[in-house]
Amino acid sequence: MFLGKITKRVMTKGRIILLVLAVAVIAELAAQEHTDTLRTKALPEVEVEARRVIRQGTTDSYFPSKAQRERSANAFSLLGNLHLPGIVVDQVERTLNYTRGGGRVALEINGKPSNIDELLSLPVSRLKKVQLVRVPSVKYGTDVAVVINVVAGRGDSGVGLGLNAMNALTTNYNDDALWFRFNTGVHELGVNYNFKLNGIDKAFTRTNEHINNPTGLMVNRKIDGRFSGGNYRDDFLSLYYTLNRTNRRTIDVRTSLDWDRFPQRAIDATVDDGSSYTMRTLNESDERQLGLKVYYEERFSARNVLNVWLAANAFANKYQRGFSSPTANKHYDVDGKKQSARLETEFSHTFSPACKLAVGWQQSLAHTSNTYVSLQNTNFNYDDNSQYAFAQACGSLGKLTYSLGMGYARDAVWQRGKGFEHYAWRPKFYVQYAFNDIWQIDYNLSSTTSLPSLAQMTAYERQDDDQRTTMGNPSLRPFTTYRHWLSLNANKGIFSFMAFGMYEYNHGSIVDMLAITPMGTVQQSWTNDGQYKHLEIGIYCGLNLLGEHLQVYAEPKYVTFISRATLRHNRSNFCLQLGASGWVKKWGFNGYFRTAMESMEGDMLEHRTGTSDVNVNYAFRNVHVKLGWRNLFSCEGPATRKILETTNARYETVQGNLGFANMVYVGLSWSFFKGKQTKRRKESRQVDASFDSGIVK
């Protein structure tokens, strides 16, 4: 009977959603009655060449200039030279981060899920444009803030190979990659290999504790920790095959092996609580991951497209942890295994250049087994089963552009016969009004669902130090966050401008909890007692000067948090980002500066110190050399400070790496190609627009 009520309610809401989508499509068809459907004229070539950024609905298309292409070693370095608003392209650590609220950056190549390793091996000559999807469709789920889609042409026939090296001169930091490909024009075979070797001897951790124990006595402790031991190493090997029949069919098959390991390392901490003694924590990990990804795209016609993506992963993780002090000694091993798979399908139909309807289905399965080996072995098994269905329609009515999407998700997690099933609607609404060719205003409404991690749900007590333990909470439940976004945008010649505001809130969020035991020790866990409000207001300004040989941008913003768990917290701060890049003949430079940023959840405040980077690069044919200086005049480099303040305790922990303070690094990119290069005409038309690995904890 209960399932019947749920089914009836779901079907009723589903009919309403489908009716709304149908009305939107019919309205669009009426508005397009006098157009020539897919044969509508493209923008004149002169206009596209004059405007490097073209906004169309939720997507901004960036057309790289000749100077930007010549000074970019690969597609990833080109992303950095484009200065995409709200995106931080870290050329040293090779990451993409979003600076406006939460969420990650999803990366695609020609609409196919991709990663940075693939961008490092993608020649700039194949790149047509970069699309920044500011409002991702409902198919991307809950944690994607923006999507970067690199539109590339088919590869040249022949053999190519290349090297991308990033190495520090002042500390032990190495991130190097090799790639090889053989292309016949339609078929392509390739190999990517990435090697990382990083030292830990300059890493540090510091903690200040203030605890009110049950007797009313305030206990203060200072802990100063230093790392020693083996270096972190990661080897990643990927083999792939791609079939690309232009405008008809694409098949991409990739298999990968990732070996991530950390030889035994020690954290030696000096404790000062009136007396002085030493604690030692030993850690060792060895994780191997085998992955398979298959992407299939079929263009039945210019109007109808089917996309299918299948991913499967197998993990094996061995983790050892030991702790010792004058009053406590505990050691355990974790033998973890995980098998997971994910299937995504999407079918889209284009009614006109401005009207499109997409529907899809996603299914994911995972099984995790963690065995804690100690005096008494303890086993935890987890089973995840999730389904997600979605539909989205987008179109335009005169100067008004809209996108209406709805998804319905079922998430189920089970451990030891207990767990939860969570059902959630995920609406997404977007509307844009264009005052003219220069000014537009956007509004976006969306909701996301956050699930508890396996570590947060594992009821195994871990000894952090002689006074503190951590234990998961199997009763945790998902929670929903609602977000409103409003922006005013302008693009005119050399000038780009955006004024934006973002407000998000949730109830019942997962937050840290501290409990004081009768013995005066502290146990950390998690609860669903959080409430959260987050507001951001900012401005972005960008300029292209000296015939696009100099680019500068600035983004100041004001951020405020109101968070409640055991206490009510109100925190505000001002953030500023500045950046510039320029070219003179074969020489170029890049630089950026970011002030400190903060975020808050429950009673936990996270403060990330500011960072800076400046580098000079030289390009000669297929060789690009870069010399850089990171975190100038910084004493400790980038560090993260976490402050957890409750009614009976206050913890302040700082973690960082001195190796990234005043770090001097050198980068080298080289590529070689032998074969027949295809002549490519200039792009003169607009082209319309996770797999969660679940590392064993």
Predicted regions: what is each one?
Residues 165-169, 184, 195-199, 257-263, ...:
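Transmembrane beta-strands of outer-membrane beta-barrel pores
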Residues 33-68, 92-93:
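Short, acidic, small-residue-rich periplasmic hinge/interaction motif at the N-terminus
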Residues 234-262, 280-418, 424, 434, ...:
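Face-selective signature of the C-terminal outer-membrane beta-barrel domain
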Residues 45-47, 75-80, 94-97, 117, ...:
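N-terminal periplasmic accessory domains that precede
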Residues 111-137, 178-180, 239:
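Short acidic/polar hinge/loop motifs at secondary-structure boundaries
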Residues 340-342, 388, 473, 477, ...:
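Outer membrane beta-barrel strand-and-loop segments of large Gram-negative receptors
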Residues 76-112:
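Extracytoplasmic beta-strand/coil segments of soluble accessory domains associated
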